[in-house]
Amino acid sequence: MGKANKVVLAYSGGVDTSVCIPYLKEEYGVEHVIAFAADLGQGDELDEIKKKAISAGASQSLIGNLVKPFIEDFAFPAIRSNALYQGRYPLSTALARPLIAKKLVEIARELNADGVAHGCTGKGNDQVRFDVTIGALAPDLQLLTPAREWGMSREETIAYGEKYGIVPPVSKKNPYSIDLNLLGRSIEAGPLEDPFQMPSEEVFGITSSIADSPNEPEIADILFENGYPVAINGEEMEPVSLIKKANSLAGKHGFGRLDIIEDRVVGIKSREIYETPGLLLLIKAHQEIESLTLPADLLDTKSRLERQWADLVYKGFWFSPLKEALDGFINYSQKQVNGTVRVRLFKGNVDVIGRKSKENSLYISDMSTYGSEDKFNHKSAEGFIYVWGLPSRIWSWINK
């Protein structure tokens, strides 16, 4: 257990981080707890969260608007990387953690704090992401992790908090644990801990059910420049507005729900429900424009590195030499990723129905057509195939 006099706490307003405030003071001897809540576009009543921290005993309660850097510096690189952990989860929650941890360190430096703290438990991924990031950015700061060390059950944690006037937001009527930001929602706990039980419609908040989604399909064009999405249906937007538009567009049609078994960093499997309509839509469209503008060997290599990029981010290594090296590769690969992808949204599905790139398309109709315009030299195929298959013939000559 580390010791610190002034601590900056990553604060969400939930039970664990609220209980951390009196616990740090009573059990760790911390004199000043500075609560920091990040605005990531979640739409919470942040003023209420600020008041709640003070009520729980914080010396200061700070709110930081991180929406713009969250989307521009974390979400958009993930889109260019086609980042899907285990091929499915687009890291909507994981991407926020290194940004919050970085901000904790910055505030600690500004206010001359000698420690930082978080309320992550010992079973989750976030403890890893916070600890690894803080260790990479500020190994000299004391890192306090009361929720990992106090050994209280959920009921005991709530009872401890009630002694200090902390009211739990989770009840029998709402047993779910929900994390929300502009990229989407993650929902777990409660009835969802049974992986065979279908989630009820009440757990979803930003995607329509199939029954309630429009009965007519909608067509949308998404424009990419250097791998970045820059416009939807001809309307250019800055990144935050574009994500909001993509969320609205895809969510309305019931696209973006995930119900998956996920392998956590600590080695256990968990059942996770995600709503990430806009992010999944943009990744799908980005994959398609890449297929038109990048050569096969680059696509193949990038697809393998994308999985490694997603693994690094999921496991807390945003600020690592390998992640930085992969960023360099991905940035180079995106120079020619320019063009428009047309999608059809309908009843929970997004289908790509068109793609074009004026300057960078590697699709040449005169070479691909089977019509009279065909300019491909068919006679060259025979020699190519002979050389291409030569290793197989040599093997056969020697061994058969």
From Swiss-Prot:
Binding-site residues, ATP: A10, Y11, S12, G13, G14, V15, D16, T17, S18, A38, G119
Compartments reported by the entry: Cytoplasm
Residues bound to L-aspartate: T121, N125, D126
Recorded metabolic or biological pathway in which this protein acts: Amino-acid biosynthesis; L-arginine biosynthesis; L-arginine from L-ornithine and carbamoyl phosphate: step 2/3
Keywords: Amino-acid biosynthesis, Arginine biosynthesis, ATP-binding, Cytoplasm, Ligase, Nucleotide-binding
Listed HAMAP family: Arg_succ_synth_type1
The protein's name in its UniProt record: Argininosuccinate synthase
Organism: Prochlorococcus marinus (strain NATL2A)
